[in-house]
Amino acid sequence: DLPADYQKVPLDMSQWKGETSEATLVPNLHTYRYAHDLLGAFVQQVQSGPLKDTTLIAATGDHNVRSFGVYAEPSRRYLMRQVPFVIWGPQLRCGQQLTQPASHRDMFNTLFPLAGIEGNYINAGRNLLKDVPAQPDPMNAPRGLFFTGEARNAHGMWQLGNPKSFVCTAARPPQSCEFNAQDDLQDRARYALLDWNVRISLQK
């Protein structure tokens, strides 16, 4: 339950693209807003205080409110797999990475250098504050890979090995928004390698 003194913000449900029959939808949306208000207030407090130049704040989350049909449209299904990752700090710029898919495995590779920690992190992804190389290595290419056998690049999302399942997901899809066979081949190999790694680690 939200605090009794919390001032709820009016909701324009005409903007909601999913189903609206669930009784918990509106309470979830208010909780979502409340959590963001608290985080925003905390960040503003730090940024206006004496520690602003020596403090790094990172936040991520997984908001279940997305499960209320908001991804019923094929072009919005990537929201099933999308969570926020926000970093506040002096003079931080993410450049071209802002439009590229990333995953939780990229977080520590991004945060450690900012904290002065050098060296590779186990099973790390890429540093999201550096530009993507012209030829990124397949293990750390700017794509998302999910245990369900789905993959996502900057243009769209698809089921591995199924070109017909490709759906454009970018807010402003480029004219070249189409299935990329090379991305699919690399991610099928990466999926198999990660599956093998997990099974070996668990001695299955």
Task: Show the residue positions of the predicted features.
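Solvent-exposed soluble domains appended to multi-pass membrane proteins
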Residues: 1-204
